[in-house]
Amino acid sequence: MKLNDLRDKDGATHSKKRLGRGIGSGSGKTAGRGVKGQKARSGVAINGFEGGQMPLYRRLPKRGFNNIFAKSFVVVSLARIQEAVDAKKLDAKATVTAEALVAAGVIRRVKDGVRVLSDGELKAKLAFDVAGASKAAIEKIEKAGGSVKLPEKAAAE
């Protein structure tokens, strides 16, 4: 067998239907599009329109709202911070702040602050000055000999 002998098995492929090539073909003239009207024309797709039937987005009830005061925190795990310390990207003696994490490449941008979560283990003794931290994360940080400074309101979380 040679490369030029290779071909698909019989019946594996179908030749495409050639539309609009005379009425004898069975799909000539209107080419399977019916008669006139918007859908017979080219370039038609009305998103969300279901032919007059009440569309799905109107059948479902409205729910919820967007809180304009919602804070969006960047989430960082303890494991990710420990990796940065091990790789010497984050100074273990300096305070860990949002700006320090951006400079170390741990996070890309600070939205409304950084929230530390307890994923992974923390071996380094670090001082944190962040917008938020989970209770478990605070426990792990203090167990490693570090400290956490939170804003007044976030401390009640």
UniProtKB/Swiss-Prot annotation:
The keyword Ribosomal protein applies. It comes from the Bacteria. Residues 21-35 have a biased composition (Gly residues). Pfam families: Ribosomal_L27A. Keywords: Ribonucleoprotein, Ribosomal protein, RNA-binding, rRNA-binding. Disulfide bonds: none annotated. One of its GO terms (cellular component) is cytosolic large ribosomal subunit. GO terms for biological process: translation. Residues 1-39 are annotated as: Disordered. Residues 1-13 have a biased composition (Basic and acidic residues). InterPro entries: Ribosomal_uL15, Ribosomal_uL15/eL18, Ribosomal_uL15/eL18_sf, Ribosomal_uL15_bac-type, Ribosomal_uL15_CS. GO terms for molecular function: rRNA binding; structural constituent of ribosome. Binds to the 23S rRNA. Part of the 50S ribosomal subunit. PANTHER family: 50S RIBOSOMAL PROTEIN L15, LARGE RIBOSOMAL SUBUNIT PROTEIN UL15M. Belongs to the universal ribosomal protein uL15 family. This is Large ribosomal subunit protein uL15. It comes from Mesorhizobium japonicum (strain LMG 29417 / CECT 9101 / MAFF 303099) (Mesorhizobium loti (strain MAFF 303099)).
